[in-house]
Amino acid sequence: MALETVPKDLRHLRACLLCSLVKTIDQFEYDGCDNCDAYLQMKGNREMVYDCTSSSFDGIIAMMSPGDSWVSKWQRVSNFKPGVYAVSVTGRLPQGIVRELKSRGVAYKSRDTAIKT
């Protein structure tokens, strides 16, 4: 796991609404999302960081080898980069972003375990 992926502080943590990666708000703005930046373009765009991440999430998992872990398969992060992931993320991506993802062939499934989609 790359050190820059690990949250640098326990305050101002946010989780990506698409992949559930957890970072500080500044890390998302500076580096974007390691898994989703090709689609969400959060890097350098604080407004997109607020739209595409949530400060409300439950549990965290540090994933070192996502391809080898049954937990990563259960959490649907086995194809993502090593990092810290939320178990459940409250919220949904804005409809415009969901439509854009669909037009690019990316299926969006909410990471909020309270909502069944």
Curated annotation (Swiss-Prot):
One term under GO cellular component: DSIF complex
GO biological process, one term: regulation of DNA-templated transcription
Binding-site positions, Zn(2+): C16, C19, C33, C36
Subcellular location: Nucleus
Modified residue annotations for N-acetylalanine: A2
CDD domains noted in UniProt: Spt4 (cd07973)
Post-translational modification: Ubiquitinated by UBR5 when not assembled in the DSIF complex, leading to its degradation: UBR5 recognizes and binds a degron that is not accessible when SUPT4H1 is part of the DSIF complex.
Major place of residence: nucleus
A GO molecular-function annotation: RNA polymerase II complex binding
InterPro entries, A to Z: RPABC4/Spt4 (IPR029040), Spt4 (IPR009287), Spt4/RpoE2_Znf (IPR022800), Spt4_sf (IPR038510)
Region span, Interaction with SUPT5H: 2-40
Keywords of this entry: Acetylation, Activator, Metal-binding, Nucleus, Repressor, Transcription, Transcription regulation, Ubl conjugation, Zinc, Zinc-finger
Start-end of C4-type zinc fingers: 16-36
Entry's family note: Belongs to the SPT4 family.
Task of the protein: Component of the DRB sensitivity-inducing factor complex (DSIF complex), which regulates mRNA processing and transcription elongation by RNA polymerase II. DSIF positively regulates mRNA capping by stimulating the mRNA guanylyltransferase activity of RNGTT/CAP1A. DSIF also acts cooperatively with the negative elongation factor complex (NELF complex) to enhance transcriptional pausing at sites proximal to the promoter. Transcriptional pausing may facilitate the assembly of an elongation competent RNA polymerase II complex.
Assembly behavior: Interacts with SUPT5H to form DSIF. DSIF interacts with the positive transcription elongation factor b complex (P-TEFb complex), which is composed of CDK9 and cyclin-T (CCNT1 or CCNT2). DSIF interacts with RNA polymerase II, and this interaction is reduced by phosphorylation of the C-terminal domain (CTD) of POLR2A by P-TEFb. DSIF also interacts with the NELF complex, which is composed of NELFA, NELFB, NELFD and NELFE, and this interaction occurs following prior binding of DSIF to RNA polymerase II.
Protein's recorded name: Transcription elongation factor SPT4
Gene name of the record: SUPT4H1
